[in-house]
Amino acid sequence: MSYSLRIADLPEDERPREKLLKYGAKHLGNAELIAILLATGQGKGKLSAVGLGQYILQQLGQNRQDPMDVLRNIHPQELIAFPGIGPAKATTILAAVELGKRVFQSRPLEKMVVDSPEAAAIALSQDLMWQTQEHFAIVMLDVKNRLLATKVITIGTATETLIHPREIFREVIKQGATRLIVAHNHPSGGLEPSPEDIRLTEFLLQGAQYLQIPVLDHLILGHGKHQSLRQCTDLWERFPQGD
């Protein structure tokens, strides 16, 4: 596809809007999705809307960055700096990005059963998934793993958060929960548990054994992904929770 060719001059099955209607949004590339938001390119003889979308992604992807990660938190003036992008197009893109975040984060909480890392990640996505600071939160459950409440316990720096097990179990007992899942985010998007993450989990599992309030998992969240320490470590074999 020529990125200077007007979308109106493309074969119908190559036009972003027509492709979306015929095949669904998931079949469009990122540049094509941006093109739909832009509606127009830079003008006659210059980049089409698809070409401009591709150019934006290329520029955002400099220095080996993921352009979608950059776009997730981009400032309006950064978009307006691109030739062919004015306030109207910039705000349309930013509104779409924000709407996507909210759709991802939205979930029905009442009577939600949290019986997997995926379900726990959904329950905590609004509090943890896209934060630029490190947050530590807990999911409190009843005996049937039904969600009672979620709570952010601490907000730390971008690299660490300070938490003591007693703060966690105090809140769990206060809510009348019988089991819990703990979680924190890595603002970098990396999901590898740090030595501090492992040590804190050990302390929590030991405290849970003493209080007979099982800790079902410790999740790390970031940039739309999650990691379960129960699945990637042997901590629950070393400190059984009786769950």
Swiss-Prot record:
Key words, A-Z: Hydrolase, Metal-binding, Metalloprotease, Protease, Zinc
Residue ranges of the TM segments: none
Chain ranges of the MPN domain: 113-235
Keyword Nucleotide-binding: no
Motif (JAMM motif): 184-197
InterPro entries tied to this protein: MPN (IPR037518), RadC_JAB (IPR025657), UPF0758 (IPR001405), UPF0758_CS (IPR020891), UPF0758_N (IPR046778)
Keyword Protease: yes
Gene Ontology MF annotations: metal ion binding; metallopeptidase activity
Protein residues bound to Zn(2+): 184, 186, 197
Single biological process term from Gene Ontology: proteolysis
CDD domains: MPN_DUF2466
Entry superkingdom: Bacteria
PANTHER family for the chain: DNA REPAIR PROTEIN RADC, UPF0758 PROTEIN YEES-RELATED
Record-stated family: Belongs to the UPF0758 family.
UniProt protein name: UPF0758 protein sll0766
